[in-house]
Amino acid sequence: AASDVYKRQILTRVAKSHLRVGTFEYFASRQQWEDLKLLADFAIQRHFPKIRETDNHYLELLKKVASNQSILIANWMSVGFIHGVMNTDNFTISGETIDYGPCAFLDEYHPGKVFSSIDQNGRYAYGNQPSISSWNLASLAGCLIAFIDKDSDKANELATEVLENYSVDTNQRILDLMCMKIGLDGSKKNNQEILRNLLKLMMDNESDFTITFRSLSDILLNNSDNFLAQFHQKDEVSGWINNWKSALNLENKNVCLLYTSPSPRDRTT
């Protein structure tokens, strides 16, 4: 009846701000330089007030955004999160996840996985997220370039260095977090190769991303059934397990604790 009372609830997520790269592009595209400078100053005041004391706080703004986004993207990748619509309007200055969707977490592992029906060419596919974030950051750099240095060549040189460092740092962060999922140190080349071999096996066997990594801990408890169930190439996987165990012996860590501690809830912002 119309007079009946039903309990309902609303989940609201509040961001530190809704400033995005697209906000900067809006003013830059109209050559509204004074307004763009005011926006940059507000972003600094809102998110990074300490950099106002630096000699080149617009360059530092770019560096801070790069650092925050690098951490965010690496965490996305490590838990199999696909944002879905990574255009500049959804790329925050604060380094938070907003306006995601159609978003999802990976089921069967594949770098080209998309969940958005409008993303026909896979621009925002899981494996493309680091490069798309770099593209978005370059767009922000283009908006700030006139404020970074009056000498355009010098400004471009400084911005390019930030972008190059971003790509290197992000790729290493992804390796570190992904290697952590298998109990290994991501800075070691051999461990990186072991990770890549596992991901190749997962792709070829259409293995579930989360279940595969989670079931690795069972192997250390002498139960490999859950892990092996994710693969039909049993011989290749058995060889990988042997290589992985050899690498683990060199790490000398409490690997079971590492496996059970990280979770998507704790590691995405």
Feature locations, PLM:
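Regulatory N- and C-terminal appendages and interdomain linkers associated
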Residues: 120-261, 265
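ATP-dependent phospho-/nucleotidyl transfer catalytic cores
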Residues: 4-83, 94-181, 185-188
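Catalytic-loop Lys-Pro-X-Asn motif of eukaryotic-like protein kinases
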Residues: 88
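Ala/Thr-enriched low-complexity intrinsically disordered regions
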Residues: 268-269
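Conserved small/polar residues in nucleotide/adenosyl-binding loops
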Residues: 2-9, 259-264
